[in-house]
UniProtKB/Swiss-Prot annotation:
The keyword Cytoplasm applies. One of its GO terms (molecular function) is deoxyribose-phosphate aldolase activity. This is Deoxyribose-phosphate aldolase. Keywords: Cytoplasm, Lyase, Schiff base. One of its GO terms (biological process) is deoxyribonucleotide catabolic process. It catalyses: 2-deoxy-D-ribose 5-phosphate = D-glyceraldehyde 3-phosphate + acetaldehyde. InterPro entries: Aldolase_TIM (IPR013785), DeoC (IPR011343), DeoC/FbaB/LacD_aldolase (IPR002915), DeoC_typeI (IPR028581).
Length: 223
């Protein structure tokens, strides 16, 4: 797999709580220059970012982030507001308290409501795999499939661990047809990226890959 093919799967990400507009601009510029799938940024920057890229790049943002325990109504509003401001893709965090209470019906209904608010925009569902048992992850693969979401996503990157090969293997085995997989959190090498893709991920959330590619390009004058 060529580096360009890896980059096309990347949501180039900056979600730091202290992110400044110049830092966001750099993320956007790099994402456009390297033709990544999107740039994933805080919702407060979406409107300005959408105007800045002027349709040249998909803008992704997060809702219910990073803990997921805001109400469904609040998440629906966040989704609608983000889309109105120019977001193309939404990454939502599920309410893990519902999962731990065994209330998967509530999780599914919340995702359905947010998908309806998304309309034809892409919805990715963050399940925070590092906080799940294997059985819970398998159950959530079914929940996300039934809900109509476009992607199941491993991690926020703000919890105890990010994506693992094992979790992506489970997702690939149990998620339904038509639902894609996004691996995110801790992807820090091109080899890891290739492995996640080989295991079934079609989108990668990372802030590091472009830096690695730039370093390699300095050595070889190309990517």
């Amino acid at each position: 797999m060529e580096v360009k093919d890896i980059l096309k799967t990347v949501d180039h990400t900056l979600l730091a709580t202290t992110a400044t507009w110049p830092e966001i601009q750099t993320i956007l510029d790099d994402a456009m220059a390297y033709e990544t799938a999107s740039a994933c940024i805080p919702a407060s920057y979406v409107k300005k970012a959408a105007e800045y890229v002027s349709g040249k790049l998909a803008i992704c943002t997060v809702i219910g982030f990073p803990n997921g325990y805001s109400t469904t109504a609040a998440k629906v509003f966040e989704c609608q507001d983000a889309i109105q401001n120019g977001a193309d893709e939404i990454d939502m965090v599920i309410n893990l308290t519902d999962v731990k209470n065994g209330d998967f019906d509530t999780v599914e209904e919340e995702i359905r409501q947010i998908k309806a608010a998304c309309q034809d925009h892409i919805l990715k569902v963050i399940v925070e795999t590092c906080q799940l048992t294997k059985e819970e992850l398998i159950e959530l693969c079914g929940v996300v499939t039934r809900s109509g979401a476009d992607f199941i996503k491993t991690s926020t990157g703000f919890s105890t661990a990010g994506a693992t090969f094992e979790d992506v293997e489970v997702m690939a085995k149990y998620v339904g047809e038509g639902v894609k997989i996004k691996a995110a959190g801790g992807i820090s090498s091109l080899e890891d990226a290739k492995t996640f893709i080989a295991l079934g991920a079609s989108r990668l959330g990372t802030s590091r890959i472009i830096k690695i590619v730039k370093n390699e390009a300095t050595k070889t004058d190309s990517y």
